[in-house]
Amino acid sequence: MSALRPRISLPLDLHLAGRRPEIEVARHTLRPAGRARLDALVATPAEPRGVLVYFPGFNTPLGPWETAKCQYLAQATSMQVVLTEIPGMSRYGDPIPRAIRAEMLRGRIGAWADLNLAYLSAAIDGGWVAHTATVQALGYSTGCSLATAALPALAELGPIDGLNLVEPVAISRRNLASLEAHNMLDFGRMPLVLATNLGHDWVMSAYRRQWREPSVKYGPADLLAIATVLSGEELSWHLDDIELARCALARGSRSSLCRRADFEKVDASLQARGIGGPTVTVEGLGHQLWHSFPVVTHLIEAMLA
């Protein structure tokens, strides 16, 4: 085990520490410079010491489920938490602009990340996010790619305290058929993940209320563009070009989308560059581990607290 990059194995622990945090989460609708609408959530703890920019995964509606995650993140880090819907995957159903989609179909994420940053900037310019003395970024799945690509721009807000990547996908080169096969394998593990929430009444209440909320909408052209970005290794390339002091990594031991060999390669590269941070493995679960509230709370503590 490296002191610089400690290895942490998290057993599947169904315990959910404490009650749901009572932290205010505000919802905003953003439309910067005439662009399509996206929703944003901002969670503000008492006396925040910085901002945590959270980049969610594919097909993530900003309802009761994500609201509760924001509250936990804000409580564990004492940071203001901000996230937006992913451009091209919103409750409003507006597509990714054609020029940006064309770049994504070439495997390039930069223009899409810039579009996402425009919405984050709108939240900051609106005065809803003001605590930027330090900045952390957190991504899950697709959000890992957006977080990594956005990090140089986020550094303009304030000093980057850390990058936190849960189940990064775009660290492996594979064709679209393989990506979909791995996605289906992991999707088959979803019932086990959701079962970890049973017995926690307020979590299940949030889950049921989430199903009554509008889902995000996206078209086949945008789905293909996002899949193309995720089927390459651009996240790893961006990470190699970024200067940072700390990067925490996490994956599920049974994950197919975040392959172990490629995950280990990213960890080894960070180690060789002297970049600290834990490398966490959640035992017994796959890619969808972020849908388990017990796992989320333990991961937040291991990676961010």
Language-model features: where?
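Conserved alpha/beta-hydrolase "acid-adjacent" motif
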Residues: 256-265
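Flexible "cap/lid" loop of the alpha/beta hydrolase fold
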Residues: 148, 152, 160-191
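Catalytic histidine-centered segment of alpha/beta-hydrolase-like enzymes
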Residues: 283-295
